[in-house]
C-alpha cells in the first residue's frame, strides 16, 4: 500500500520507523536521514517543537532497527537492498597512507647524520686541543710529590722499627 493511499488515522498508528521503511520502499533508493525524517514529520503533522524532540529518537531507532543500513554521509537505505560484500565496501573507508610522515622522519634522520659526519682530521684536532690543555709538567710534578711522600713514610716506618729493635735489645740484656 502506498503512502498516499493511507488515511490520516493509519499514519498516526504507524511508528516513525514503519513510515521510514515505507518511504524508502516507495522511493526505491537510499536517502538522506533528514529528508526521510522531514517526510515522516510532514505525514504525521509534527510541529517544530515535536520535530526537535523526535529527531534524535528516530535516528536512534534507525540505528537499532535491523532493517536500515547507513551508507555514510547521512545516507540511509534498506539493508535488504545491499548484498553483504557491497555494503561492506561502501561503508569501509580506505585507510590513508602515511608515507608523508615517514618521509619527514627520514629527512630528519638524514639531517642528523649530516651533523654527525666528523672527519679523522677533525678528531685529531680535538684530541690535540685536549692534550694542549693538560700540562704534562704538572702531572710529573704530582707524581714526584707522591713518590716523595711514600719515601718519607717508608723512612718513618724504618725508624720506628729501629727504635723497637733497640728497645728489645735493651730488654734482653
From Swiss-Prot:
Chain residue ranges for the region called Disordered: 86-173
UniProt GO BP: DNA-templated transcription; regulation of DNA-templated transcription
Cited InterPro entries: Asxl_HARE-HTH (IPR007759), RNAP_delta_N_dom_sf (IPR038087), RpoE (IPR029757)
Compositionally biased intervals (Acidic residues): 109-173
Coiled-coil residue spans: none
Key words, A-Z: DNA-directed RNA polymerase, Nucleotidyltransferase, Transcription, Transferase
Keyword Nucleotidyltransferase: yes
Cellular component GO terms held in the UniProt record: DNA-directed RNA polymerase complex
Xref: Pfam families: HARE-HTH (PF05066)
HTH HARE-type domain mapped to chain residues: 14-81
Keyword Phosphoprotein recorded: no
GO molecular function, one term: DNA-directed RNA polymerase activity
Subunit structure, as described in the record: RNAP is composed of a core of 2 alpha, a beta and a beta' subunits. The core is associated with a delta subunit and one of several sigma factors.
Function (record text): Participates in both the initiation and recycling phases of transcription. In the presence of the delta subunit, RNAP displays an increased specificity of transcription, a decreased affinity for nucleic acids, and an increased efficiency of RNA synthesis because of enhanced recycling.
Family that this chain belongs to: Belongs to the RpoE family.
Name the UniProt record assigns to this protein: Probable DNA-directed RNA polymerase subunit delta
Amino acid at each position: 500500500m502506498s503512502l498516499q493511499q493511507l488515511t490520516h488515522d493509519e499514519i498516526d498508528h504507524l511508528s516513525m520507523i514503519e513510515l521510514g521503511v515505507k518511504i524508502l520502499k516507495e522511493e526505491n533508493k537510499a536517502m538522506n536521514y533528514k529528508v526521510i525524517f522531514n517526510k515522516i514529520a510532514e505525514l504525521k503533522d509534527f510541529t517544530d517543537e515535536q520535530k526537535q524532540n523526535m529527531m534524535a529518537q528516530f535516528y536512534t531507532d534507525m540505528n537499532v532497527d535491523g532493517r536500515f543500513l547507513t551508507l555514510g554521509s547521512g545516507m540511509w537505505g534498506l539493508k535488504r537492498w545491499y548484498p553483504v560484500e557491497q555494503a561492506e565496501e561502501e561503508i569501509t573507508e580506505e585507510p590513508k597512507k602515511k608515507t608523508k610522515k615517514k618521509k619527514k622522519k627520514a629527512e630528519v634522520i638524514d639531517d642528523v647524520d649530516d651533523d654527525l659526519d666528523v672527519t679523522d682530521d677533525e678528531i685529531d684536532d680535538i684530541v690535540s686541543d685536549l692534550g694542549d690543555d693538560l700540562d704534562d709538567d704538572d702531572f710529573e710534578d704530582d707524581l714526584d710529590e707522591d713518590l716523595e711522600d711514600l719515601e718519607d713514610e717508608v723512612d718513618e716506618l724504618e725508624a720506628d722499627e729501629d727504635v723497637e729493635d733497640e728497645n728489645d735489645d735493651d730488654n734482653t740484656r
